[in-house]
Amino acid sequence: VQNVVPVEERLADATLAERRGQYAAEVRRLIDAAFSVMRATGDIDPQVRDIVKAAGLSNQAFYRHFASKDALLLAVLADGQRQLVDYLNARVGSTTDPEAQVRSWIEGVLAQARNPVAADATRPFAINGARLADRYPDDLAATRAELLTTLAPSVRALGGSDQDASFVCELALARMNDAIAHRRHPQPQEVQRLVAFCLAGVRHGT
């Protein structure tokens, strides 16, 4: 017996697929608009009206996807985190040598401060880090844990511990955030000094 999908179900599926694509595009526009507004103002608390205006959408579209502005900010954080994790994974995956992997990871983090475009995009989060941690402690802890997964295996391969990886991660991110907050672009010598310091710390702990 041939399994024929009723016409109403096929039409409903087609409509849902079309709306899914439309809604995904709207969410992308809202996230990009929020990034744009925050980069322009340096504030992590933009007005909804400014976001929807930049996105070319309506308040109705905004609240169709996000229950609140905080929900959008979490999506913005998650999106930026995903991009950074993908970037660091690609860097670490370009070599099989664990020391080179740790070096590349640290250089990749500091590159966010050395690149003017990346620094401008990250600056609102760098200067409001304490406020974000107070507002979204669980979400920020989860993003930090995800970042650690891109570094910890390489540190362990050098004989270090997960705590060592956490120290390296915290130090690299602190240096990045400090540079971004003060609109300072770390010089190559500073980056390499930080790399040498972190590698020495990992080896000292073994």
Functional labels for PLM-detected ranges:
Residues 24-36, 87:
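A short, Lys/Arg-enriched amphipathic alpha-helix from helix-turn-helix/homeodomain DNA-binding modules
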Residues 93-95, 141-172, 179-183, 202-206:
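Hydrophobic alpha-helical bundle segments that form small-molecule/ligand-binding pockets
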Residues 75, 89-115, 168:
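Hydrophobic alpha-helical connector segments
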Residues 110-152, 159, 180-181:
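Short secondary-structure transition hinges
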Residues 29, 50, 71, 100-108, ...:
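Amphipathic alpha-helical interaction segments
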Residues 29, 37-71, 75:
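Helix-turn-helix
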Residues 1-25, 206:
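N-terminal intrinsically disordered/low-complexity leader segments
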Residues 73-80, 143:
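Alpha-helical DNA-contacting segments of helix-turn-helix folds
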